[in-house]
Amino acid sequence: MRKIRTKICGITTPEDAAAAAAAGADAVGLVFFQGSSRAVDIARAKKITAALPPFVSVVALFVNESAQNIRRILAEVPIHIIQFHGDEDDAFCRQFHRPYIKAIRVQTASDIRNAATRFPDAQALLFDAYHPSEYGGTGNRFDWTLLAEYSGKPWVLAGGLTPENVGEAVRITGAESVDVSGGVEASKGKKDAAKVAAFIATANRLSR
């Protein structure tokens, strides 16, 4: 049986984390990028992770952050996986000795085709919509048909997903992992528990 794994990104409160876990999320994402409306600091991150049950993975999202700050956060917050969303290269990403996901902002098929070669040590790649000045969480989607024949390194689909379109997205791309942030929000940084539950329920129905 194939299970569609779900990550709810941009969690900012313990209550939203607990609701995501209760709905069946496999992972939650904490944004440590101060340029984001969904950013959290170490103190807030500790409260969020304390609200989670066992076996829900915590993913820390960084954008062009210094190695020193990343190490400080990893030392204080229980992080399972790092997600790099900026211009980091493989050598930078692998130095923390933690499984990492590299976000790829997709414009053309070559972005997808070359990603595994550029990031050989990544546990997975996350394919997101390209934006010239923003690093994820834009609500934009890219051409999902570009992924229809992809069979490389494990990957995650992101970019403009919602409870209403995640089914179509999975059918077109064959994604086995999906990541959502803005598509399940009531407002910037605040999740809508009903939308979170609907998103995860749809993904679960697609599992086989």
UniProtKB/Swiss-Prot annotation:
The keyword Ion transport does not apply. InterPro entries: Aldolase_TIM, PRAI_dom, RibuloseP-bd_barrel, TrpF_fam. The keyword Repressor does not apply. One of its GO terms (molecular function) is phosphoribosylanthranilate isomerase activity. It catalyses: N-(5-phospho-beta-D-ribosyl)anthranilate = 1-(2-carboxyphenylamino)-1-deoxy-D-ribulose 5-phosphate. Keywords: Amino-acid biosynthesis, Aromatic amino acid biosynthesis, Isomerase, Tryptophan biosynthesis. GO terms for biological process: L-tryptophan biosynthetic process. Pathway: Amino-acid biosynthesis; L-tryptophan biosynthesis; L-tryptophan from chorismate: step 3/5. It is an enzyme of class 5 (isomerase). Belongs to the TrpF family. This is N-(5'-phosphoribosyl)anthranilate isomerase. It comes from Neisseria meningitidis serogroup B (strain ATCC BAA-335 / MC58).
